[in-house]
Amino acid sequence: MKIKTLFLKNIKKYKKFLKREKDSIRYSSGIVVLKKGEEVGEHKTDNVEEIIVVLEGEATIFVEGKKYKKLKSPSVVYIPPNVVHNVVNNSSKVLKYIYITSKLQWMCGCVNG
């Protein structure tokens, strides 16, 4: 593993930054750019925690199919493991956010596969 850098300019839609077990021991991350009306799509992160950092615009977070919260930049939200969620851009401006996911670990500090 080595130090990596990602410049956040000129990203059109999606750019993976860290791939778990390749670039990092337990983290995965990237940047997402959504235009008005676009969404990531409902998904569940299973045994993974997720942090979403809103850099620009507004994100509407849906949890289990219901509107949870509208976040304006700069904002951060934590999504626990095994939660079905979606990120939607309902504003007229572009939404840019960084996501960071981390696999759960046992108390002993061993990576939970």
Where are these regions (language model features)?
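Glycine- and acidic-residue-biased ligand/ion/polar-headgroup-sensing regions
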Residues: 47-49, 53-59
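Short beta-strand segments in beta-sandwich/barrel cores
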Residues: 38-41, 57-62
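Short, surface-exposed secondary-structure edge patches
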Residues: 31, 51, 67-69
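A short, N-terminal "cap"/entry segment at the start of jelly-roll beta-barrel domains
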Residues: 1-28, 41, 109-113
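Conserved short histidine dyad/triad with adjacent acidic residue
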Residues: 30-46
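Ligand-binding loop in jelly-roll beta-barrel domains
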Residues: 81-106
